Swiss-Prot record:
NCBIfam families: aroE, PRK00258.3-3. Belongs to the shikimate dehydrogenase family. Pathway: Metabolic intermediate biosynthesis; chorismate biosynthesis; chorismate from D-erythrose 4-phosphate and phosphoenolpyruvate: step 4/7. Its EC number is 1.1.1.25. This is Shikimate dehydrogenase (NADP(+)). It comes from Streptococcus pyogenes serotype M6 (strain ATCC BAA-946 / MGAS10394). Shikimate binds at residues 22-24, 69, 94, 111, 238. GO terms for molecular function: NADP binding; shikimate 3-dehydrogenase (NADP+) activity. Signal peptide: none annotated. It is an enzyme of class 1 (oxidoreductase). GO terms for biological process: amino acid biosynthetic process; aromatic amino acid family biosynthetic process; chorismate biosynthetic process; shikimate metabolic process. InterPro entries: Aminoacid_DH-like_N_sf, NAD(P)-bd_dom_sf, SDH_C, Shikimate_DH, Shikimate_DH-bd_N, Shikimate_DH_fam.
Amino acid sequence: MSERLSGHTLLVSLLATPIRHSLSPKMHNEAYAKLGLDYAYLAFEVGTEQLADAVQGIRALGIRGSNVSMPNKEAILPLLDDLSPAAELVGAVNTVVNKDGKGHLVGHITDGIGALRALADEGVSVKNKIITLAGVGGAGKAIAVQLAFDGAKEIRLFNRQATRLSSVQKLVTKLNQLTRTKVTLQDLEDQTAFKEAIRESHLFIDATSVGMKPLENLSLITDPELIRPDLVVFDIVYSPAETKLLAFARQHGAQKVINGLGMVLYQGAEAFKLITGQDMPVDAIKPLLGDK
């Protein structure tokens, strides 16, 4: 990267903590190099306490854009000037665009688009399908919105945090009003309802942190009877590449198991396009992500 840094180089950032596991710097910097773009992507260890100062830094330094990850995806909302329609609906942001570097910051959410492109890449269509989705944080809400926009027949949402259920219910109401998709919300602690939903679903999506450290030995599904030859299981965790859930689903004969690497690639590609105006060369970037 040092060979192409100059006084004209445009900076893009990542604001999150922890950041050491992130694949984004490698992906974006390789894409800049492939396309000959004079950009550089740097990750900054920023939590909610430092977030306001970091956002002001984007404005002051003319940083052209930033990716935003945990724990900042919702906390950044009041610090921005505008939101895309999807980001406003989801109530979370993972990409900030500073158009022309002039300090007007617009928040976008690309998680949902990334997830659906990853599924399509694996030959999985969501149109007219019944889908169970566990975990309705920033990423989960974005995926739910995109599933509804892309024509899912029914989305059964499950979430463990009772304090979040009321805010998610507002999203459920909006999706039922704006789309033809039937969307419901239940507590993940209700295992009877959870198991029934999976039995009736074509696709199960785990958008929780279960499966990644320190929860790498846990799985939301432990009953082999829930895994069927016509069930697709998608875990948005990408480290480890095969979570306990995916290993269990593979062992018991799921139609297909998909990890989060494809979602990382395609949400990154969408963010790349928003910030640079160029298409990320995804075929060249895929090998950097390792085995899917």
